């Protein structure tokens, strides 16, 4: 995402002179909610005694996993995120497990075997949204990324409006990251069932295609990922549950197997979604005013290590990068000029 600001300056001549009894805990704050991706965690199957122990630990562990250096693109963009924990108390711990005839009393009705798939763990999204909206009421916090932590050890998860996972499972952190690929970046699964053939149209997800000639990710063709297991970006047959007729961009990324990085196409999609929520500049000098030689023009970026700011006068680059520029240092002749700050 690019942001361009236009300042007017006047160089004078010498003669002129901002439900469930749930509570909210902010666990990571990198800036105003209006210009950050707000990660909202909600838990199910946690009793009151587990909220500040098990649930807290599950959320903290998940956050640490997201911003682990091996899970690009999140570490580079950490300052673009805030994170908040909605504390919802259940009467009993765990989740329903119909196949094993286990039923527990939880606030959000988390259950395995959703849609008849044993490992598909999900909860009542209406109840989850009601709890979260109540906890956030009056806080000014947006809901940009929805994350559902379920207090269960059995493998399972699901990605829809909410990314939901069994937080007590041994691979819980990978499940969480994979499901966020669905819920936030709208990515498709890249694994498949042997023998299945695709007979539908072109999928709308960016990481699967039914027709390589459409060139869905041609701009990345030949890119050799630093992770050798991901390999070179190409069109690999087998994706979205079908062995034939659908193609994925890489041999083996996070959307195909757990404990893998995201490939370039998925990383790019995450970054695009981040910039839909975050303006690269947090604040700037009033750009509706006119300034003189004694003034300094400035902007504040979300993260100067990620965002470069280039300055222009009347459309011509000054070759200057930085968050401020002194007008006097530009050595402009007397007159009126337009100065632009462009985030890169």
Residue ranges with predicted function:
Residues 50-56, 156-177:
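Short pre-active-site segment immediately N-terminal to the catalytic Zn-binding motif
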Residues 42-46, 86-89, 148-153, 186-188, ...:
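Active-site-proximal beta-strand/loop segments in catalytic clefts of secreted hydrolases
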Residues 329-336:
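Surface-exposed, short loops/turns at beta-strand junctions within beta-sandwich domains
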Residues 1-18:
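Secretory targeting signatures
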Residues 19-135:
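Propeptide-to-catalytic entry region of secreted or membrane-anchored zinc metalloproteases
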Residues 94-97, 128-166:
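Catalytic zinc-binding patch centered on the HExxH motif and its immediate surroundings
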Residues 173-190:
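Active-site recognition of the HExxH zinc-binding catalytic motif
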